[in-house]
Amino acid sequence: MMIKWIISILTMSIMPVLVYSSSIFRFRSEDVELCYGNLYFDRIYNNVVNIKYIPEHIPYKYNFINRTFSVDELDNNVFFTHGYFLKHKYGSLNPSLIVSLSGNLKYNDIQCSVNVSCLIKNLATSISTILTSKHKTYSLHRSKCITIIGYDSIIWYKDINDKYNDIYDFTAICMLIASTLIVTIYVFKKIKMNS
């Protein structure tokens, strides 16, 4: 009988932590999908290049607010930055996600080499993600290079300057304490009634 109560106390104690962990993982995995896609590079003339980035997947819960794209070229190096602001479909008008994809593309007559980094700032969870990729080489065919963007490393970190910092941690801890107290009081009352 006592083992049954101990198992229920442990279950009630662990549940809020599991809910918190799964929600953070869900936010991270959906956001990271915005960094994967195809980068099309086309050298039109000697001094003119055309770069186009198409994300592989856009999570259904986001709408685009604004998009920026800049390209600079020096010799055979092309530097590009692609930034976009997204908001939740059913949220406020303010952006809830900022994604910045930047990179360096170096090309010659037969190949192109790409270094890419992607920064995602989720304003809802105050979590930022950095993805980096180095020296991916692709063949140049008729002055065109199609790059499939993948990453070597992923770093997640929680922003410390946000006014809502640790609100999810605080909520999970409060739920853990409350559920443990409720179950403990219930167990003690049951034990008193049975004795």
Curated annotation (Swiss-Prot):
Membrane topology (Cytoplasmic): 188-195
Residue positions the entry lists as glycosylated: N66, N115
Cellular-component GO terms for this entry: host cell membrane; host cell surface; membrane
Record field: transmembrane: 167-187
Main location: host cell
InterPro entries, per the entry: Orthopox_A43R
Subcellular location: Host membrane; Host cell surface
Membrane topology: Single-pass type I membrane protein
Extracellular side: 23-166
UniProt keyword annotations, A-Z: Glycoprotein, Host membrane, Late protein, Membrane, Signal, Transmembrane, Transmembrane helix
Signal sequence annotation: 1-21
Family affiliation: Belongs to the orthopoxvirus OPG172 protein family.
Protein name (Swiss-Prot/TrEMBL): Protein A43
Organism: Variola virus (isolate Human/India/Ind3/1967)
Record lineage: Viruses, Varidnaviria, Bamfordvirae, Nucleocytoviricota, Pokkesviricetes
